[in-house]
Amino acid sequence: MSKTELIKRYILFVISLFFAALGVAFTKHGELGVSPISSVANVLSDKFTFLSLGTWLVIWNCVLIVGQILLLRKNFQPIQLLQVPLSFLFGWFTDFGMWIMSFIPADTYPLRLVMVFVGIVVLGFGISLAVIANVIMNSGEAFVKAAADITKKDFGNVKIAFDILCVIIALILSLVFFNFTVVGIREGTVLSAVLTGIVVKFFNAVLQKPLDKILCGKSPR
């Protein structure tokens, strides 16, 4: 891979972070629950409001990075430490997205549902760009891969288990912090879990060839 192509891929990855963060902001603005992987940070941001959602996402991502190190130990590749600054960038993008959302009304249930669906599409678009960039995984996906490698289990199955675990942790935190009330986990969480993968596959099919041409400087064979 040439230096120029590598730079292009990292630029695309940064762009993917922006859209993924914007997708999170849309779903958060809908107040019907966020994606499973963001649900823990979402509940914590609702309880401890002195820190923004973006900041809690940075903290959660760093926890997942530490988890990777503990799982992989000597097999953890130093290049993966790039996840740390990229997590901070993702958090900043999320807070910027929340600022944008402050100008968009979502005061009725239909509008909130629209926010969720738009968020899922935008999030899926961002994830697709990250997949096509193919330079570094986000901390959530990297943690799942580490767990899959250690347990010798299928990545897809581990991803499902991880999403369920995130929701369970968020649910426990919600019950503890909000007097046995479920906060931040709603139909939007379920919709995100079910539909995001479908959206990612759609965008992969549409964008893979044209973006490969841009990244590689020639039409893929």
Task: Name what the model sees in each region.
Residues M1-R221:
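Core subunits and conserved enzymes of cellular information-processing
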